[in-house]
Amino acid sequence: EFLFKKNKVTYFKGIGSFKSANKISILDDKKKETVIETEKTVISTGSVPVSLPGIEFDEKIIVSSTGALALDAVPKKMVVVGGGYIGLEMGSVWSRLGAEVHVVEFLENITPGMDREVSTEFMKILKKQGINFHMQTKVEGIKKSAKAATISTSNKDGKKVNFDCDVVLISVGRKPNT
């Protein structure tokens, strides 16, 4: 909202519907309707974290990036599933706060879409921070108990490895609210 105000953009929050090409009805949380006329409209629907098939976020042991920001304490051991920007940022924060962090990534490199050389250098920096990487490794399942989880994985050679941890951060992408 700050950036909207700073850039002189009018911000409305609510349920919107187009009355015509340039008229929009906005119903706020108090059911008050506001009708606005506009030349240009930006619709920002937001997004939600994507999980792995059959695995649900509980935001305590199996967390999304939102849950990772709200943890009550620094976990002893965290496994980050996914080597993209969001998971690496969260993993880096928790590592610097004292957690042992392992990143499990299905692909060969972290930060898909980034220049390979930059990605390689970025990974070196994160390793110096103490983050452990398990590349070309597939998550096959997660078993959760009351206070921990075990992640079952297999690497590109078929070797099976289990990771025990206090928190699993699943950071494999986001899906738009459409």
For each feature predicted by the language model, list its residue ranges.
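Helical element adjacent to the flavin cofactor pocket in flavoenzyme catalytic cores
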Residues: 1-11, 39, 45-49, 122-133
